[in-house]
Every structure is written in structure tokens, then in C-alpha cells.
Amino acid sequence: MDTRHPLARLAAIVLNYRTPADTMAAVASLRASQRRLDHLIIVDNDPDDECRRALAGDPAVTYLSTAQNLGFSGGMNVGIRIALERGADAVLLVNSDATVPTDCIAFLVDALESTADAGIAGPVIRSRSQPDRIASVGMTYAPRSGRMRHRLAGTRQPSFESRSVRRVDGVSGCVMLVTRRVFESIGLLEEDYFYSFEDLAFCLTARRAGFTTVVAEMATAYHEGGRSIGAESPRRLYFAARNHLLLATRHGSPGALAARWRLLSIVALNVAHAVIAPGGSLPTRLRAVAHGTRDYLNGSHGNDA
């Protein structure tokens, strides 16, 4: 399927949740982009006076305040609907704790316009506090085990020599460019996830509809994960366990035996992560994983933590 067509009108959405300083930095980086944005939309998941004062009166910004915390998927969907209503050909999703260099968006657009079946593009993600450390060069996903990995995560590479557009299973939602045709084909982000794994789930659903996800390896973004929820907080561990299982159920290999293997493998992985995670007490971290596993088994989704 050839999905190439010019992406003339671009919109960017920044999601804020109790991180006004980060949000301002994200907005500033988008304003400086070489590639012009037709719409810059801020969705505030927890109405913040500082953000409102700085952005609500700015004629170049659409500031939207939600009545409650809708999570990453729900908050972004509020902005995506507005962007599509205004005629955007592609929508850039940007988490508040991410920033983009001036050339990032142009590289992402070029990757989508030059790749026959591409509908989603992401940059190389680097740590904002340690810029030589790579956080992700796209994701790999194994449907049999349900395991996912961020390519090259944790490696130190001051410069990334590859300039290719690489097909991957998914890209991080912290900076993700999605064409209008993808949204029209598969809908918006799945709000069952609320927080965590919604990006990979969206990419895998898009693949079923014939769209490829790519990493534009010449593009870079900087991200400091977990700023709004806590990098290794029990709540983050809860969502990681529950949503990993949910994704594996929806995008795993068929068969009862494979499903049982995936459940055991994913639970073991999340328990191991809780054991080595810094901060808080080990019993609290393990309870968070157990809670997430139990809620998955009980069919609890969304913001049911």
C-alpha cells in the first residue's frame, strides 16, 4: 500500500500534567522548528495556573483544559480531534518532558513522505540529562513472548552515524508523527491503556491496517521519562505490568499455550524490574506489580489503579 502524499499542514500537541516548566521547554523547542507548524495545541490534563497564564492568551497556541486527568491516550486524543478538525495532514505528539531540535520535525516529515507505506515516524530518543545516552531507536516486539525492547537503549553514542529510515515495530509516544490517514483508518489512541504501552499498541494496530512505523535515524529528540508520574513509582510499575499484559493479549500469537507462556513471562519480567528498581520499599513495588496483574485478569482498564 502506497500511502505517500505531501504532508502540507502539520499540528503538534503537547500534553501537560503537573510539569509546567517542562511543558514550556517543549513548546519553546516546537516554536523554533525549521518546519512550520500550522497548529500548536496544549492539552492540560491537570489545569495548571502557570501554564494557563503563559499559554492561554497566546494567539499562536490553542490551550485546552480537561476536567480530569485523562492519561496520555485520553489527553492526546482531545488534541488529536481538534487537529484533525482543523485539517492537519499529520499530527506530532509530544510529551511535556520531551524537546526537539530545530531539524527534527522536517526529518520526520521527510521520512513519511519518502517511504511508501509509512504512517508513523519517530526520531532517535536521547536522555535529556545525559545527551550521549540513547533511550530508544524504535521498539521491537515479539508476539510469541509478548516481550518488547527499545533498540539500543542505554548505549552511549555521542553521535548517531546512520542516516537511514528504518522500519520498526513501534516508536516512543514521547515524540511521534502520525499521518491523518492512519487516524482515519484505525481511530485514535486506545484509552484502555491510560498510561504506558499505548504507543506500541497504536503502532501494532496501524501495522494490521497496512501502515509501517519508521525511525528517522537522522532525527533526534530529548526525553526525560516519568517526570509526571515518577520514573520508578509504584503507580508506574502498576501500569507497566497491567498494560504489558493487555497489549500482549491483543497483539500476541494465537493459542492457549502461547497465552499462558506470555502471561508468565511478562509477570516474571515485571517482578524482576520491581526488584531492581530504585526508590521506595520492595514490598510496595511488588504489590504494585501484583495489583496490575490482578486488574488485568479482572478486566480493569483505563485509570482504574
Model-derived segments and their meaning:
Residues 235-240, 253-305:
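Non-catalytic, C-terminal membrane-associated alpha-helical segments of glycosyltransferases
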Residues 20, 44-52, 68:
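A conserved acidic beta->alpha catalytic loop
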Residues 66-86:
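Glycine-rich, basic loop-to-helix element that forms the pyrophosphate-binding segment
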